[in-house]
Amino acid sequence: MLPGLFIHLAEADNSWRVVHTDGRPHLPPDELEPLYNGDETAHWEGDTLVIDSISLDERTWINPNGWFHSDQAHVIERLRRPSMNYMEYQYTVEDPKVLTKPWTSAWDTYSLSKGDLIENFCTNNENIEQLKKLHELESSKK
C-alpha cells in the first residue's frame, strides 16, 4: 500500500495490479478501453478494501477455473486482514449477459508468506521436448 494506491503483486505469471484508492470514479463510458484487469477503483469500508472493476477484456478469468464473462461484467472484490498473518478475500460478479443474478463467493482465507516471491512464468514454449512430441504427433496425422 502507498498513499492513494493499492499495488497487488502476484506470484503467478509475474503479474501485478495498480488500483487507485483515492476516491476517483471509473472513467466515463466513452473513455473506457477493455483491459486485462479492467478499469479499477477502490475505497475503504472500515477495515475492508473494496475494489470495483469494469471493462474487463476477453482474456480475463473471473476465477481460477476459467469462468467466462461478457463485456458487461462488473466485479467487486473485498479484502481484509484480520491479523498480520492472514488475508481474507471475497468477490461478487454481476454480469447480466451471463448470470441471472449477482454471484458472491464465500470468504477465502489466505496465509501470508514470510518468504520472497518466487519467479513463475507461463509461456507457450516452456517445455520444448513436449512441443517436439506434439509436433511429431501432428506431423504423423498428415
Segments from the language model and where they lie:
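PEST-like low-complexity, intrinsically disordered acidic/proline/serine-rich tracts
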Residues: 1-142
